[in-house]
Amino acid sequence: MFEQWDALCAVLFSFSIAQELKTHADIVNQKGEKIGKAELIQTNSGVLIKLEASNLPPNAELAFHIHELGKCDPPDFKSAKGHFNPFKKKHGLLNPEGPHAGDMPNIHTDDKGNVRVQVLNPFVTLKKGKKNSLFKEGGTALVIHGGPDDYKSDPAGNAGKRIACGVVK
């Protein structure tokens, strides 16, 4: 009896692992050099993004967004286009008419320019075929800006130039 139960548990556990949705993005700087990585994991509440990066401005507050196209052409990363906004909202976590699905809290670097943070984005999914899927046609990208997002100014929060980018794979 217990052997059958153990076998059933093993099968169910294997199935749940196989069904877990996760992906990653390699983060590159304006020279195209890899400076970090983000792991993206689907949860019941949205997508958990675990970001680790280095060689960013030290002791800085920096905007961190999901952009609408999966391209990261240095040095300016304009190829990633604007913020991911499938629901046509206004920009900003503090905007009553927002936010964009790609809007996320600012990140903070340490005195050496390193960041290690986890951000839950409840507005996006890794499930294919959904309007807010990061796997939409053309893909999406994670972008780090050189300044903080003010959480309200349209279209991008006065966050400054794009200093790092990673295509969601």
Curated annotation (Swiss-Prot):
Its EC number is 1.15.1.1. Binds 1 copper ion per subunit. Binds 1 zinc ion per subunit. This is Superoxide dismutase [Cu-Zn] 1. Disulfide bonds join C72-C165. The keyword Zinc applies. It comes from the Bacteria. Zn(2+) binds at H83, H91, H100, D103. Cu cation binds at H65, H67, H83, H145. The keyword Transmembrane does not apply. Its cofactor is Cu cation; Zn(2+). Destroys radicals which are normally produced within the cells and which are toxic to biological systems. It is an enzyme of class 1 (oxidoreductase). It holds the Pfam family Sod_Cu. It catalyses: 2 superoxide + 2 H(+) = H2O2 + O2. CDD domains: Cu-Zn_Superoxide_Dismutase. GO terms for molecular function: copper ion binding; superoxide dismutase activity. GO terms for biological process: removal of superoxide radicals.
